[in-house]
Amino acid sequence: MTLLTQSSTWQALSAHSKNVPHMRELFATDAARFNKMSLSACGLLLDYSKNRATAETLDLLFALASNSQLEAKIKAMFAGEIINTTEKRAVLHTALRSTAEQSIIAEGQDIVPEVQQTLNKMQGFVSSVTSGQWKGYTSKAITDIVSIGIGGSFLGPKIVSQALRPYWNPELKCHFVANVDGTSISEKLKLLDPETTLFIMSSKSFGTQETLTNTLTAREWFLAKGGLQSDVAKHFVAVTSNVAKATDFGIDADNIFPMWDWVGGRYSLWSAIGLPIALLIGMDNFRALLSGAHQMDEHFANAPLTENMPVIMGLLSLWYGNFFNAQSHVVLTYDHYLRGLPAYFQQLDMESNGKSVTLNGTDVDYSTGPVIWGGEGTNGQHAYHQLLHQGTALIPADFIMPLQSHNPIGEHHDQLASNCFGQTQALMQGRTFDEALAELANSALSATEKQLIAKHKVMPGNKPSNTLLMDKLTPSTLGALIALYEHRTFVQGAIWDINSFDQWGVELGKDLGNDVLARIGASQDCDALDASSNALINLYRQGKI
């Protein structure tokens, strides 16, 4: 057993998990439960009353956090200590949304001035493009942005841009390319005019396979459509640490934005990686996005554990994963603009906490990161919600909804909200056999049929959920929401004693992919790998089954 599972608090939680009353009973015996188990911070309200949790549960979870030195670990992250121990890096995405007055030290120097300098450079660039001052090679203004990246440099900008659609500059369109599948970029290029298109290449090394391949294809298309190599600088900019490679490609050094080792890809949308966002919504709104995240940073760093929104959400998720064998967690967004958030949180959580050894290399003997999945309401209610209500797996849920819509048409939002709240209620209370039977009392079914159908209509309830509300989806509330999930992820990793900031599984996939690519291009069939890989590679070389 690890020190974590040997601890008295862990053992107490294990014993306590077998004795928590049904949520129906918890609500029936405490009319003030919502008031006791909800809190507001940074423009968000969290209702966590619909959880399998009592005051004793929370006390034990907070004790587990304290015993795991969570507060010290939070301070270490914000202070720029080397908490990504396997890569010997600080973890300071929070510095990207700090105020200019702050001082944050990394590798012996204050990094805030460089962050502010980059924001100011972004401001100038955004102003140049959106004002029409930036011209393409035929002196036409830019109308289309193509953001080329992968992982965090793709998903963050795409999802945030999608979420903030009401704030877009109507004169600009943005297209996102990530997958190395040629179909992805080909379909985008069909829509574009090379004279008015600007490409943003985001890669720390300027050598990430997918990103470089797509960028080279974009340049080939640009040159084939009439542009010259000397025109590339008017249509390509980069976010990278490798200035030499970018300038060799044809990008002007003045149009290269920095990346830093202390920012992981999945936490990078707040940096110059967010340039597509800034172009679409303007720098004032981009700064509001940063401000909302900064407010959540301050809350996370300073609120006591018992009143700390990311801490509470992280602990409750851990509670179900480690003591109720919940192996997945569903995120349900009741706002069409937020439909991409489940995929973003999936990457954030699963890439961070999909680990199986502790910081000192000991194999864990407890579950770590769950599968994160989800979608938008009310679509999911006519699909996978069935499994949430009557399936055999326990799947905790997060419901996210703005109280006000950007598109208040008729009763649409009233119906959306009623479905959202109704789902949380149904998951919590379920339906007993007697209730199901009573509903069938006036039907034409026989007594035997009523008994049978009632059995099928029973729902156990006691299915946990959180509800997150905001007045309206704005850059600020979105920033706070994303930072909330970042810190929630940190909380779990800190208690599990794993490194939430490396991704060696991703690196292995890259290495083996490069090896296979070389074998595909070899002059002879492959026979050096396992039988399955050999066969698949050789079938691909033949081009037919």
From Swiss-Prot:
**Which pathway?**
Carbohydrate biosynthesis; gluconeogenesis; Carbohydrate degradation; glycolysis; D-glyceraldehyde 3-phosphate and glycerone phosphate from D-glucose: step 2/4
Q: Which residues form the active site?
A: 351, 382, 510
| A single BP term in Gene Ontology | gluconeogenesis
Q: What is its EC number?
A: 5.3.1.9
Q: Where does it live in the cell?
A: Cytoplasm
Its EC top class is: isomerase
Q: Which UniProt keywords apply?
A: Cytoplasm, Gluconeogenesis, Glycolysis, Isomerase
Catalytic reaction(s) noted: alpha-D-glucose 6-phosphate = beta-D-fructose 6-phosphate
GO cellular component terms attached to this protein's record = cytosol
Q: Which CDD domains match?
A: SIS_PGI_1, SIS_PGI_2
Under the heading Gene3D superfamilies, the entry gives: 1.10.1390.10, Glucose-6-phosphate isomerase like protein, domain 1
A GO molecular function for this record? Answer: monosaccharide binding
Q: What InterPro entries would the database entry show?
A: G6P_Isomerase (IPR001672), G6P_Isomerase_C (IPR023096), Phosphoglucose_isomerase_CS (IPR018189), SIS_dom_sf (IPR046348), SIS_PGI_1 (IPR035476), SIS_PGI_2 (IPR035482)
Cysteines paired by S-S bonds: none
- Statement: the UniProt record of this protein carries the keyword Ligase: no
Q: Which family does it belong to?
A: Belongs to the GPI family.
The record's annotation in HAMAP family points to: G6P_isomerase
Q: What does this protein do?
A: Catalyzes the reversible isomerization of glucose-6-phosphate to fructose-6-phosphate.
What protein is this chain from? Glucose-6-phosphate isomerase
Organism of provenance = Shewanella baltica (strain OS155 / ATCC BAA-1091)
